[in-house]
Amino acid sequence: MSKKTFLTERQKTVLEMRERGWSQKKIARELKTTRQNVSAIERKAMENIEKSRNTLDFVKFLKSPVRILCRRGDTLDEIIKRLLEESNKEGIHVIHDSITLAFLIREKASHRIVHRVVKSDFEIGVTRDGEIIVDLNS
């Protein structure tokens, strides 16, 4: 496993112990600190992990050969149709079926889609591997 991460050694230790099923109280005793401190370390580690995931998604989106803009008023069905058509033009096989695509898009853009209709613009990218990246920063 790579040593270079965005996690401190203390965060790694706490996450490893939590993964083994240790309670925060037990970790605190072992590390000679408070349970509140263990909780704060774990919370900050999870924030760092989420930021890392967001960074990777951003880079994947930048490199996506297929990007479609989902505009206010577009329906989920229209978006999926355009997404699949544009992917086919690029020779990319999307790794999800239409039902799963609808679920993924609604899950990632839940506050921008109401009753299968886009309420505020966002973009979707498709990687060369057919992975879907929803970019809410547009």
Swiss-Prot record:
InterPro entries: RNA_pol_sigma70_r4, Tfx_C, Tfx_DNA-bd_arc, Tfx_DNA-bd_euryarc, Tfx_DNA-bd_sf_arc. Pfam families: Sigma70_r4, TFX_C. Transmembrane segments: none annotated. SUPFAM superfamilies: DNA-binding protein Tfx (SSF89915). GO terms for molecular function: DNA binding; DNA-binding transcription factor activity. GO terms for biological process: DNA-templated transcription initiation. Keywords: Activator, DNA-binding, Transcription, Transcription regulation. Coiled coil: none annotated. Transcriptional activator of the fmdECB operon. Belongs to the Tfx family. This is DNA-binding protein Tfx. The gene is tfx.
